[in-house]
Each structure stands twice: as C-alpha cells, then as structure tokens.
Amino acid sequence: MEFADSIDNIQFNLLNWFASNGRHFIPWKLRNDGSIPDQGEFLSPYEIWIAEVMLQQTQVKVVLSYWEKWMLSFPTLIHLVEADEHEVLMHWQGLGYYSRAKRIHQSAKLLIEHIGSDNIFDTSCWPIEIDQWIQLPGIGKSTAGSIISSAFDLPVPILDGNVKRIFSRMVSIE
C-alpha cells in the first residue's frame, strides 16, 4: 500500500467515525439557526475563539453552559472590550484558570485594534494565519489552528492532546 493510500484510508476512517460518533451539537460549530454549515462556509471567529480558549484543559460538557452564558453577556467583540476585567472574571467564575479570562480580555482589545470596530462581523478582516493568532495572549499553535480551521474552513494543522492520543493509538505508542 502506498503512503498516500494509507493517508486517504486514515482520513476516510476518521471522518466516518466522526459522522457516527462526533459531537454535532456544539453551538459554536453551528449556524445561528442550529444547522450544520456547508463546507467552505465561515462561522463566527469570535464565538469559536472564546470556545477554544474555554476548552483549554476543560471538558466540552462543562464549557457548553459557560459559553452560552458568555455569549449572552458578551455577544460581540465590542461588548467584551467594553466590559471591565472584573465583569469578565465574574463570568469566568467556576471555569478555573482565571488567567485565560484575563488573556481573552487583553486579546479582545488587540483584535479590535487589528480589525476595527466597524469590521467585527466581516470575517475577511479577522486574522487567518497561525502566526497572527499566536501573537495574542493565551493562543498557541493548536488553538490557533482550531480557530482558523473551524471559523474559516482552512486546512491548518491542529496537534492537541486529542490528536496526539489518536495517533498514539493508531501506531500503538503509549
């Protein structure tokens, strides 16, 4: 079997597994009406960014309710920038690792400078390169890759703990 064939086989099997077992209910990966986006369709970079930072060292089932409350209080980047740090930390209460909330708040201010307050809903104004995202506090390569691939449907690598675990199982490494 050629190497390219084995890659195609791995991709096929992973996509089939996800179709049967994946989390299809995650609100930041759905359209506003709750439907699944088409391939190539952009989702909210803001909503995905907040979710990805919340998901750092926290399970999805815990993040879901916090993310929904966050989006009610800070529905846009501008709402987040206009909030004071105390308010941001109050909404983070219970998630732990409060430095993540502080970094989100700092990053929001930097993103507004980069994007401009008039362009927050224009996905073409948001960063789409890993090197741009990792300049923001609290964003590493895996988080940046996940934001870019989810929000902009671009093929960028994500090598987080889950991906490493899958590869380890595939090649029998402990």
Model regions: which residues?
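Intrinsically disordered, low-complexity, charged terminal extensions of DNA damage-control enzymes
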Residues: M1-I36, E41
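Catalytic cores of DNA base-excision repair glycosylases
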Residues: H24-E174
